[in-house]
Amino acid sequence: MTGPDGPASTTDAPAVPSLDVDHLTVRFAGLLALDDVTFTVRPGTVHALIGPNGAGKSTCFNVLSGVYRATSGSVRFGEHELTGMSPHRIAGLGVARIFQNLALPPHATVEDSLLLGRHRLTRTGFVAAGLRLPSAAREERAHRARVREIAEFVGLAEHLTRPAGSLSYGQQKLAELARALCMEPRLLLLDEPVAGMTADERRRVAAVIAGVRDSLGISIVLVEHDMGVVMRLADTVTVLDFGRLIADGAPVDVQNDPEVVRAYLGAEATP
């Protein structure tokens, strides 16, 4: 049931581990995209990854999700070494990524779009599903019930029967987040989740993200250019500039770091 503590998971997922990025280096044809980057995402926290354009944020996200392979260094999610794993295998460990661009099937209902997130949790075989055996019907009912719980959690319960493409932009971004939550993730990678939104939409999505951390205990790595959202949500902030880590710590400390000020404003750092 959905309540003040959010929708409890219907799976027996193991505890959320830390994500440890250790001396991560990525080179592309001589270009150093990431240079010996090290940071740790503590379990159940929001960890913002920020920096000017070209700082290496997208490259880092692509390594974390298995799209790119690191030249050297490691990425560990608990006991699992992610470096070199395929995106599919990483997703199977409970890592879900939401891209900046919308990817909902526009003509499918919101409920069916969210149901796609349950795919990796489906145990019924193709034959049983095709024949509509009782086991398949029971599993589908359970998945749809979970979808409705998560839709309620993000504020989309009244829109489940609408085509996903008919939602407002902010609602579609919430639907993307809900679909990722339907995967029962332990780690969420959010790529600019409030980009292009109105102020009201940004506040709403930020509140849902905070609820994911506070109610569900899911770790979140957040790439976002809206510094107001970053400072409100993040427990820890890592700052990249030209592929190098220049700051890592609490938001208030990072915000006042001279190296960060210089990277963003081009001003001379003061002693």
Where are the regions a protein language model picked out?
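Glycine-rich phosphate-binding loops of nucleotide-dependent enzymes
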Residues: T2-P7, D12-P271
